[in-house]
Amino acid sequence: MRNLIIALLMALPLSATAQGIIRHDTPKPQRQQTTKKPAAKQAAKPAPKAADPIKKLYSDMVYVEGGTFTMGAKADENYWDVEHAWPAHQVTVSGFYLCKYETTQALWQKVMGRNPSLYRGANHPVESVSWNDIQEFIRKLNALTGKHYRLPTEAEWEWAARGGNRSRGYRYSGSNNIDEVAWYKKNTQDRHKPVGTKRPNELGLYDMSGNVYEFCGDGYAPYTADAQNNPCPAAADGDHPMRGGSFVGDEFDCRCSCRFGQSPTYSHNHFGFRLALSQ
């Protein structure tokens, strides 16, 4: 009997194992750790090339439709030297193209191979140029492009500054609030600014008030009360009109009517220009 009990006890573990009652812990398979490969570094993209300033000039020309307007200071305008803008008179101008920006240092450098400006910046207006310097620049530019770029006449300049056929009669070019449209002595810290950073006028032209004075192509002569068609006077004393005011000028300098004459040989760090294009 004792031997039978011992035999039964010895058989129990074997039976339990066979039936799965007794389970042995099986080690879980470990997950194989994968090492992430570092992402391949993308090659740095080259900086975009600056647009060719000569090609950009043509795309920046704005067509100014012809029309008739009153040129000169209105009767209620009263500022220093206003007598040079009297008498107001009727003028008719034909359509022409005018650059929406003042001529930049980048364009001058491209054409002339040098930069005469005192305050540097590729997208700033070129300055420290005389009327004679500008004529040499234009000759070289036209030889390079085969086009007929030129300075606007004084009548063309004022017609465009006033907004042409879209004019709303503003005192300054594009607004009666000078700070919206002009860089002048109260907001510049005596430095010109990149072109096109203020609000444009009704035609999409920038900086027609302020930033740098702009030479015109015709001669500076006293006004008369006579109506005129495309006036282009000869220089009475050799001077040429300057328009628009500058970063060192007062508010009245930036009025659309304000004008003065300058010698063709004289340059200054607030004298610049913008280009017109004949049709």
Residue ranges and their predicted role:
Residues 5, 16-155, 239, 259-279:
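Extended beta-strand/loop cores of jelly-roll/beta-sandwich
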Residues 174-177:
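Beta-propeller blade termini and top-face loops
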Residues 77-91, 165-166, 188-191, 208-279:
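Surface-exposed recognition segments
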